[in-house]
């Protein structure tokens, strides 16, 4: 179901959440991928790892912003992103930051895909973490929207927040 503003409900149990995420990662028109996910689990990374690598191979710029809130995010899942940080021969890049403030709940989930050239894009925003449950089997609600400008602005705001620290080997060692 959708409305005139191009918003649609996307759920894991319908199969649509994973299908939409996979489609957006594969879509050659999207050269920017912004992942704002409170909890990143190895089970979720395993579902999208090959497509993240394909996006990087074709020149996409990928940013992950997660958190150490409640120590839920998986070390191995962050390791996948850490291994890919930096500039790649294709002109692509991957950056990752961790929002670290024990006094603040950090709980957003947004998967934002856009074209740097046209500004067009798709976002999936709702309750799905980057986990097998969040993408395939859990009871989660997400909206698919083509209205992404405000989301990108807010993502950039969080990205530049002083509490969003770069993911590094040293940071990950302390997190273990």
How should these model regions be labeled?
Residues 1-176:
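PLD/PLD-like phosphodiesterase catalytic module centered on the HKD motif
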């Amino acid at each position: 179901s959708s409305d005139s503003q191009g918003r649609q409900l996307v759920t894991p149990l319908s199969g649509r959440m994973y299908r939409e995420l996979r489609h957006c990662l594969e879509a050659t028109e999207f050269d920017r991928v912004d992942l704002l996910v409170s909890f990143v689990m190895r089970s979720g990374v395993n579902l999208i790892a090959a497509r993240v690598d394909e996006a990087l191979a074709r020149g996409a710029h990928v940013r992950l912003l997660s958190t150490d809130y409640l120590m839920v995010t998986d070390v191995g899942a962050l390791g996948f992103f850490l291994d890919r940080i930096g500039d790649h021969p294709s002109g692509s890049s991957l950056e990752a930051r961790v929002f670290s403030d024990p006094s603040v709940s950090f709980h957003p989930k947004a998967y934002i895909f856009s074209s740097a050239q046209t500004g067009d894009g798709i976002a999936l925003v709702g309750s799905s973490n980057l986990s097998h449950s969040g993408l395939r089997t859990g009871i989660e609600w997400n909206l698919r929207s083509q209205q992404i400008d405000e989301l990108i602005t807010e993502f950039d705001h969080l990205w530049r927040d002083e509490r969003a620290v770069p993911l590094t080997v040293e940071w990950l060692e302390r997190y273990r």
